């Protein structure tokens, strides 16, 4: 099992120090690791563990409110508005670095496409005594290098991982909606929306062709197919929001590597009913979000039948309202949960 935060050693002396640390005997653990380093000053795992002990011994000290540091241009980030909504209230200021050089006493670093070459920045922050929470974005295929995790106090990331979920120091967040999509307007009722269902995007991914074949049999739908993700023929953000505002049901098939997509939360933000996918013994969205009212289907024939049934039973508007109410309540709860997670791991209160 992947254990990105654990001390990795075959040394029985260091294992003894780790056991003392796990028992809350931080002073004894520190003495043990100093003894190890007297024998071998270049023992990298012992040096790493010494930093952990030192950080725990100084954990009661009051810490500054964290600085939010972007390591890529937030203007180009689909998650910009979402990240700022979730974390804006917990940070002192925001800095755009993009050079992996700036440090702060307490810092929340937003990064993506993690590779091994980025790890020295996080190690330098760790060895400088910085408190670090990493916001790790865009690892849809779970291919990023996670070696930076061990130098962070905690990690917030999108794309829930079954393996990483076992760590209490990792908090998962939904993908959220594309920057510029959220508006303060009240959602229209189902009866005032032009389209029973709609889909805008690339149809070539996994189950999307199956979804379109099934949904095309339902009258009142609308398709805007594109050549790829964020391609030139994609709708502008305002045009896509306008389409969603006029749509009741938004089928949300998975992407190349993951069941999750921005489409789910963009549909919720516009007051639509998202239909998501699930797998046998794998209900991704319940694992990520907890109980929710969004319909989850095993096949898109099932999804199309569901839409027909909801329409015939006049149940579209009640379900739409249920999804909208859940999403309205979920967002501030997520903000509270993240604030508590940040404060607990950075000891900012």
Stretches found by the model and what they are:
Residues 49-50:
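Canonical tetratricopeptide repeat
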């Amino acid at each position: 099992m992947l254990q990105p935060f654990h001390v990795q050693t075959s040394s029985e002396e260091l294992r003894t120090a780790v056991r003392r640390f796990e028992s809350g005997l931080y002073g004894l653990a520190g003495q043990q690791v100093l003894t190890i380093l007297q024998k071998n000053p270049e023992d990298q795992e012992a040096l790493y563990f010494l930093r952990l002990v030192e950080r725990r011994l100084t954990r009661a000290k009051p810490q500054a409110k964290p600085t939010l540091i972007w390591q890529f241009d937030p203007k180009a980030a689909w998650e910009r508005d979402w990240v700022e909504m979730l974390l804006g209230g917990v940070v002192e200021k925001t800095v755009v670095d993009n050079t992996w050089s700036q440090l702060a006493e307490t810092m929340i670093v937003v990064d993506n496409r993690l590779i091994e070459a980025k790890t020295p920045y996080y190690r330098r922050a760790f060895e400088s005594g910085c408190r670090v929470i990493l916001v790790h974005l865009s690892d849809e295929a779970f291919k990023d290098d996670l070696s930076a995790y061990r130098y962070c106090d905690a990690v917030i990331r999108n794309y829930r991982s079954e393996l990483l979920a076992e760590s209490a120091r990792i908090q998962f967040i939904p993908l959220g909606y594309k920057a510029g999509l959220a508006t303060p307007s009240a959602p229209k009722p189902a009866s005032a929306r032009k389209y029973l269902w709609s889909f805008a995007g690339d149809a070539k991914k996994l189950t999307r062709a199956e979804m379109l074949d099934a949904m095309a049999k339902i009258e009142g739908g609308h398709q805007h197919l594109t050549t790829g993700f964020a391609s030139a023929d994609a709708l502008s953000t305002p045009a896509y929001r306008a389409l969603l505002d006029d749509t009741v049901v938004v089928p949300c098939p998975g992407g190349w590597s993951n069941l999750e997509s921005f489409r789910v939360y963009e549909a919720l933000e516009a007051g639509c009913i998202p239909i998501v996918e699930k797998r046998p013994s794998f209900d991704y969205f319940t694992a990520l979000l907890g109980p929710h009212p969004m319909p989850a289907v095993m096949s898109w024939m099932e999804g199309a039948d569901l839409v027909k049934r909801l329409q015939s039973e006049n149940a579209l508007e009640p379900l739409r309202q249920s999804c909208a109410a859940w999403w309205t309540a979920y967002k501030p709860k997520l903000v509270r949960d993240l604030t508590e997670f940040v404060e607990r791991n950075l000891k900012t209160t």
